[in-house]
Amino acid sequence: MKKNDLSPEAFRFEGKMSLKQALPLGMQHVLAMFVGNLTPLLIITGACGLAGGEFADLRVTLLQNAMLVAGIVTLVQLYSIGPIGGKVPIIMGTSSGFIGVFSSVTASMGGGVLAYGAIMGASLIGGLFETVLGFFLKPLRKLLPSVVTGTVVLSIGLSLISVGVNSFGGGNTAQDFGSVENLLLAIFVLVVILICKHSGSTFLSSSSILVGIICGYIAAFLMGLVLPTTALNAEGVAYTKAWVLNWNKVAEAKWFALPQLMPVKPVFDMRAIAPVMIMFIVTAVETVGDISGVIMGGMDREATDTELSGGVICDGLGSSFAALFGVLPNTSFSQNVGLVSMTKVVNRFALATGGIFLILCGLVPKLGALVSIMPQSVLGGAAVMMFSSIVVSGIQLITREPLTPRSLSIVSVALGLGYGIGANNGILAHAPQMLSLVFGGSGIVPAALVAILLNLAIPKDENG
């Protein structure tokens, strides 16, 4: 829809729009975030071993709940309930920033329902912690300039690239990992995404990830018609190849079902809570950046303290609310911030139609089942693009202000020492358990802490 075809009300947050005009604008936002909202769940449930077998129904339920929660939290962010919600034109969804930390928690706890329960327990507590931060946002903002937030975002992206590449090859648990079929399917999805992204069409560009995924499904279906779908492993046992679509799951799923509260019981374990609490500080900073970006880009003004505080509070309580439904933390979606900045459409009702559509999707298990059968290589083709773009976003944040010797030192040491320690757990083998819990596993948490400490410790001067 061209800008000239829109009512002037589309460019006012509280403008009155007809459903006919609002719906396509809301759907554009859903298309921009739909896959990204479900990708973290697909990756973490896979890492926990909850992708198939006896856990197949659980995974469908979690995907269904992810859509429902994203829709509800989006509406709260748009309209607010008291101090909860910033009344800002932002779409909320499942955060990919936690994937690295949750992957390390999963590895340290041996996977399974216990590890996923620990992730839910940590998310529940961490969300409440972020809520408290939302009430004391002013001093927090002063501690976290763009060089710190950029370093953190960069470390998040770096930690996710290997996750995306694993999916690109078919998933590292697949017996045909790295096969020609998996690689070609992933490359095909990536090429489709790139073509759509640079097609010149706003609609195709904003929905490029979803279009790439759909084309990946079609390609996998056609491959199943002309290529062998099974093979023999080294022991001579037959297995189904990772790229094969299991349509039986979709056929067996219901058309309608109410959401299930606490499909996974929260477990409170310090191995998960300690690093996740740090990540929620990072998430609060990201949300501040997203709200600032969407207000400046869409409304041409600075965000108010009330908008920022309400947005972060909604972020925190939304994440705790998500944990009650077995869903990973909810946060603002940066790709939707970019869409608002590009189109200047900030109408609350238009975005709300997208939130309502997500809620309706959350009541349809067949849709969750359809997503759950996505081949890892199809997901990987999209994930490589999504996760690498996070790296670029981090670089853009770091270079928002001229690089000085001070900022270069913060970035270099935070990434080198923080990420290096996180990537080599053995170096903390003789450290106190709490130190190992916070710094071990993912490189995100140590990089964030080192960047914050160096920003406080290194004095500022005229030369930087």
PLM regions and their residue ranges:
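Membrane-embedded hairpin module used as a gating/binding unit in multi-pass transport
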Residues: 37-38, 216-221, 225, 232-319, ...
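Hydrophobic alpha-helical transmembrane segments of multi-pass membrane proteins
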Residues: 27-34, 124, 148, 179-183, ...
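N-terminal signal-anchor module of multipass membrane proteins
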Residues: 1-90, 97-109
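Membrane-embedded helical hairpins/re-entrant loop segments and their flanking transmembrane helices
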Residues: 19, 45-87, 274-348, 463
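Membrane-embedded alpha-helical modules
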Residues: 107-226, 353-464
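Short, non-helical or kinked segments that cap or interrupt transmembrane helices
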Residues: 61-62, 84-98, 142-151, 204-211, ...
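Juxtamembrane interface elements at the cytosolic ends of transmembrane helices
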Residues: 2-7, 37-41, 45, 188-199, ...
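Intrinsically disordered, low-complexity non-transmembrane regions of multi-pass membrane transporters
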Residues: 1-25, 229-261, 296-301, 453-464
